[in-house]
Amino acid sequence: PSLLPDDRIQITREMPDWQNAIRMASAPLLDNGFINRNYIEKAIDMVETDKRFIMIADGVIIAHAGVDDGVYSMGMSFLRLPEKLSFNGYMDADIIVVLATPDKTRHLPALYQLFDLLEDEGNISAMRRAQDAHEIARLIRKYI
């Protein structure tokens, strides 16, 4: 099974504040039992306090919390916003990938595949132009 299936990829026309953007991006993982609400709030706390985020490409961040913060199984979700949003005043992003991992190593292969995908600016542009989640999923499946 794919680590990032179509039903965990969202495109929104809304412009929430950054905390709600992380909540929206996390919703598919919460709804499918990969994480609990605590994980989402801890991911928000990390941006607010520790600045422990991973900005992996221009306008693309990975939101995550710790392995002990309410993760039940490994998964990813994806949210594309209509334009870049300021995250706590120190980074701007319009693509949020939420990564949930129950240990410190199992997610690394998927993370490296995601880096490969995002290394090509053309892929990021294609994700920004995509009309629906299926288009984004097709692109991601080539890598992850």
Feature map (PLM): residue ranges:
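Cytosolic covalent-transfer regions centered on His/Cys nucleophiles
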Residues: P1-I144
